[in-house]
């Protein structure tokens, strides 16, 4: 199937599919990829995924996997300029021994889920390449089991947290498949 045509005034055809990666995830050694496809000339569906499988010395870890589908409404036309999005998020995690969010002497294992609203902008930098910046705010709920941080650490109980705040931030490099 041929790529859809863009409205008058744009130089690039609407892509069938875009593949992207978030540079901010790579800064934390987290593998990630995203896929975006059009549903209408100004609407798209994005599926982002991330994964961090690493355990560091002394059993320190910030392991996770996540999936984050999002529906976007582009102000001008798809894959160029400003957009608003609504997303869901589901993730699993196993993290501890890191000086972040009170995990220096604890390990947390569980899942989180939530939803948010995103704003972003995409700049074309070539016929098929573009750079996207995005940020989102929303709600997350985390259900977890807590342990003393060390290998086979003592079980400390279950817990949950509700969170309102940033749910997504990204600077992504996008490649269009026409």
Describe each region flagged by the PLM.
Residues 144-146, 153-162:
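A short acidic/glycine-rich loop-to-helix N-cap element
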Residues 133-139:
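Internal, hydrophobic beta-strand segments that form the core of beta-sheet-rich folds
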Residues 16-18, 28-30, 64-68, 112-116, ...:
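Transmembrane beta-barrel architecture of outer-membrane proteins
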